């Protein structure tokens, strides 16, 4: 809280130790549900795939490649030009784009009557206006999302009325079915490279060193741990009269070495695609130490990570490209799985979707989902809470019967005296579990004593709530005393005995935490003998 420097300097000159000690009174006290780890600074996290894309971009740029954006929508005729006799096999894996046709809508006398009935006050001129707008829509002069506002504007009626009119008078719009075009979503980055290189040659002379990292789409029969219907391809090309397979090997090593790969093997690809020169299509296998001993089929450290080849002159000639072109491509997601220790492509790509990814929470995240339920609302209530805790800390082991005053003062206009008591004989003011702290250890929510046995659990301060049973109980007692004063009661007693569940000691868990713990078959073990009583006398 804010303080006056002049008064502090004056007090320090008069009695430095006293001024120094009283400094703690100027620091705001944190509420039980606001203290660390509830108070924390959130930091953003990059998605594994986009993080890998960013690193790949930097790696390519460091190698002197210029970045390009290749066409994403490719007409099927381009696929035929590039892949020749293999085109049908390639197109079988492509998504074709389709669109809704624009119907030729007529307006009969029956429809005119219905329109006039629904819109009210529409004359023949208004009907002609609707007819013209529909005709413009058919010709593509009015876009689909502009149809309703265009009619509403020209007729000076509400959009809602026009929507209802179209729905009931023109059922053709509801009966439209998509019609396929010859345009496809790119399934290989190669489809875009041929188009881009052809265009570049009209304005520049080779050599070119280019790269592009972007989405491709492939019509898989199903998605699984290693295949998705849409993925990112990190592709590069070198156009040079003297380019060879050795350039592909050099690019593969230069690129992948930046990601920790240490050894490389190059093997002829059995696929032998016709858009590559025979015997130039090469698979790149690379060794990464992070894979060694992993729970994957790559536990020996080696993984197939990229493919490169020299584009066939027969394909390049279709685009009037007179120079050899080396192309190398790799799947971003596969590289991301290595860098981010993932074993399932779906779970890494879509971690927010329960059907793909396991739900994982860290202990500190669970700790932030644990709260004290009932809390005092007044400054005096907070003082009562602190007074109860202080007396229990000081006298918890005192033999009973015993009584200790925790607070006296005015609360909401009433004189109140609060005491911690134990009327029974041969026991203590507080039970042995009163000083257990609520924390999370290995995804279990526990109430534990801070002793040598549980040293490991208490080492992680980020998973400790900082709330002991006695603080949670004192908060409940203070809250109930506030409520008793409001109700005009003369006495209030709050007692806790053997705790069996969190609610019995005024602890609650966020429903998300409850669901997570139940789903993971972890445990919530907050229990123990607390045996503490607080009594308030109200005048």
UniProtKB/Swiss-Prot annotation:
EC number(s) given by UniProt: 6.1.1.27
Known role: Catalyzes the attachment of O-phosphoserine (Sep) to tRNA(Cys).
SUPFAM superfamilies the record matches: Class II aaRS and biotin synthetases
Recorded family membership: Belongs to the class-II aminoacyl-tRNA synthetase family. O-phosphoseryl-tRNA(Cys) synthetase subfamily.
Protein name stated in the entry: O-phosphoserine--tRNA(Cys) ligase
Gene: sepS
Catalytic activity: tRNA(Cys) + O-phospho-L-serine + ATP = O-phospho-L-seryl-tRNA(Cys) + AMP + diphosphate
Keywords: Aminoacyl-tRNA synthetase, ATP-binding, Ligase, Nucleotide-binding, Protein biosynthesis
One Pfam family hit: tRNA-synt_2d
Keyword Metal-binding found: no
PROSITE patterns, alphabetized: AA_TRNA_LIGASE_II
Example GO biological process: tRNA aminoacylation
Alphabetical list of InterPro entries matching this protein: aa-tRNA-synth_II, aa-tRNA-synth_II/BPL/LPL, O-Pseryl-tRNA(Cys)_ligase, Phenylalanyl-tRNA_Synthase, SepRS_C
Subunit description: Homotetramer. Interacts with SepCysS.
Organism: Methanococcoides burtonii (strain DSM 6242 / NBRC 107633 / OCM 468 / ACE-M)
Gene3D superfamilies the record matches: 6.20.250.20, Bira Bifunctional Protein, Domain 2 (3.30.930.10)
Binding residue positions for substrate: 188-190, 233-235, 275-276, 327
Molecular-function annotations in GO: ATP binding; phosphoserine-tRNA(Cys) ligase activity; tRNA binding
Tagged with keyword Ligase: yes
